[in-house]
Amino acid sequence: MPPQRSCGANSTLIRDTRMPRIYKPGSFLRVPLADGSFGYGRVLKLPHDAYYDYRTDTPDSDLDRIASKPILFKIMVRHMEERSWELIGWRELEEQFSQPIVQFMQDIGNFRDCTIFDTVGNSRRAEPQECVGLERSAVWEEVGVEERLLDTFMGRPNDDVERLKVRLK
């Protein structure tokens, strides 16, 4: 069902009435990319996913092979769209995925106001330089993940990743 629109005097509110797709942590996902190749991800503790440094020209369902690859990034993903991501299997999450995921937030008005936090509840104020290399707290749409994976595999910058980097000045 498409989003429903409600109009007010000065603005438009879009209410998404679709239900999210919920994947069990440990699920493996095959992600079709725009060039016809495939990337692979793993559902972590919701809402986080991890994406492997693994790309194939034909679909692969070998969970051992996929799980042996290094992780490119861990991000929050909103699984809402009717896309062609395929659930290809499940297994318990390995020890490497029990480590907290560390991210940052940065105030839009005062770039010096940063917070580093993790998925187990730790949080502290930080200088912008301390946030370099961390993921900004953001929820990605599936199409954005597809673009980011393909850009990474093609060795080119991703517009969303660049836009979300910490501001240093």
Where in the sequence are the language-model features?
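Intrinsically disordered, low-complexity segments enriched in serine/proline and basic residues
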Residues: 2-3
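Short N-terminal edge-element motif at the start of the domain
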Residues: 7-48
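Intrinsically disordered, charged low-complexity linkers and terminal tails
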Residues: 19, 56, 168-169
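Generic "edge-of-domain/loop-turn" microfeature
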Residues: 36-38, 48, 56, 80-82, ...
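Short acidic, gly/pro-rich beta-turn/loop elements at beta-sheet edges
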Residues: 41, 51, 83-85
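Basic/aromatic-rich interaction segments and small domains that mediate binding to polyanionic partners
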Residues: 46-63, 76-77
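Acidic, Ser/Thr-rich peripheral helices and adjacent loops at domain boundaries
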Residues: 64-73
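Beta-strand-rich cores of mature extracytoplasmic or soluble domains
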Residues: 75-169
